[in-house]
Amino acid sequence: MQVLTNTKFETVAFQWPAGFYSDGIHIGLRRHKKDFGWLFSKVPASAAGTYTTNQFQAAPTKLTKQMIDQGHQLQGLLLNSAIANSCTGEQGWQNALQEQAWLANKLNVAPNLIGVASTGLIGAQLPMDKIKNGLPQLTPTKSDAVTYAVLTTDQHPKTVCVQCELSGQLVTLTGFAKGSGMIHPKMATMLGFVTTDAQIDGPVLQDMLSTNVDQTFNQITVDGDTSTNDMVVTLANGLADNPSLQAGTTDYDIFNQALHYVLGQLAKQIAADGEGATKLVECNVVHAATTFDGQQIAKAIVGSNLVKAAIFGEDPNWGRIISTIGATDADIDVATVDIEMNGVLLVQQSLAVDFDMAAVQATLRDNQIMIDVDLHHGTASGQAWGCDLTYNYVKINASYHT
């Protein structure tokens, strides 16, 4: 067994956990790039998911949620980009069911162990002939090709892999995600997948995933729009042979920290790859009255178009930040707010302080920007991630036609 460091977990090169296989290919949904893939475990896996709150929830999202809610297990997922299969009516629903049946037949498992995930253009029907013809081309590999098959306007895949020891057994967690635009999640974000060979019951995994998604994926924003297809799914097949994880144990805490890290890293990678983005923006709020207040303020700041535009312009415009704070319904003291940008104090007790404008502007040329807010009004905190707003965001979305 690999000897781990003294940390609870460590990052490692991309690899699938024991028993997981995948593939990603091109079947003509996109012009040239990979657009179709699968991910499966050789044994049924405990499954958990979080899903978009958009009322026009897409057929694949509804279907996968139904399967996980019914049995807390999945064994395979069929994935595609380019076409979202959203707002497609009864035909879209039947197409999702057909995809499920085809993959179940290919894997020789019950249909209720199969989920479906789609992303892309809303309103178009899937070309089922291409899906059917593409299925035989999918092979069980250990490559990362599937991480490319779900991309749309993304510049690159988002992946992370960590390992930890649970009761002496080496456990791997591997996650990948897609997302660049239409990112302002509520309960989930774009498409995200985490696989692990840890042993954990589905309901326990669901509680853990939901809590961690709220603190990570739900705290990023690129453009304030919540997709119809947002979904985060976690699969745990138990092949690491650790004792089943239970709340209140050391193993549970270690795994929970590892899962939080994986989700957090994927969330930050998505924010950094926002459409047209040149800078990742992180906001930390401390001494808030409640965690909700801290999270609300942090997300409002990174989501403010005025703040995002100022960061693109490399302008430490703290007035836009404090105005955004005041526009929330958070419980604050308007006389006690401190604001720092990249470690430089701009505002103390809600009043301007002298600072070296040129020095601050120089730090804003970096591709990672940190905004720190101290409310001096409690003991809670919040964190959120976003990106700058650039000319290219408008260009990309103006040229994305139906």
Curated annotation (Swiss-Prot):
Belongs to the ArgJ family. It is an enzyme of class 2 (transferase). GO terms for cellular component: cytoplasm. Heterotetramer of two alpha and two beta chains. Catalyzes two activities which are involved in the cyclic version of arginine biosynthesis: the synthesis of N-acetylglutamate from glutamate and acetyl-CoA as the acetyl donor, and of ornithine by transacetylation between N(2)-acetylornithine and glutamate. Keywords: Acyltransferase, Amino-acid biosynthesis, Arginine biosynthesis, Autocatalytic cleavage, Cytoplasm, Multifunctional enzyme, Transferase. This is Arginine biosynthesis bifunctional protein ArgJ. Its EC number is 2.3.1.35, 2.3.1.1. It holds the Pfam family ArgJ. It is found in: Cytoplasm. It comes from Lactiplantibacillus plantarum (strain ATCC BAA-793 / NCIMB 8826 / WCFS1). The record marks T119, G120 as: Involved in the stabilization of negative charge on the oxyanion by the formation of the oxyanion hole. CDD domains: OAT.
